[in-house]
């Protein structure tokens, strides 16, 4: 009886992405949610990332922009993260509570309206541009409303005379609860949403 040889070639994929959410997995690992230019919204597991000796240590924080390499899962939508090369930490997004809240809302909103693992480079570019803008300018109501309006345009759900938030709710259901918190934090203004 002759044995068979199994291919040891691993399939690896690469993309530029922004960390939109991070959750703990067990004692040492993390689940990292990404918005990627080439892969869309996706999740990876970073094994042993919470260990101080991990090659991921200090690299997997909210809003980090990086080149990532992962091994696709055949069984689920949770892929195995292999490498991360950070190109931007965006520490300015943590300079104030309002900037952090609005940036997090942008990520949550995108996750609630975009299809998983379906690349739409324009959505990545919108999020990236919004985070970069917030890194340089204080968070305000106008920025939040502009992001929502651009998102409705890119998704094809915006209509003349219809509030962007209302258009998003009509097309995708309830908006993230953090929107209300952001608007309260940013105060009343002429562009009340």
Provide a role label for each language-model segment.
Residues 2-193:
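Non-catalytic alpha-helical scaffolds and adjoining flexible linkers that form interface surfaces
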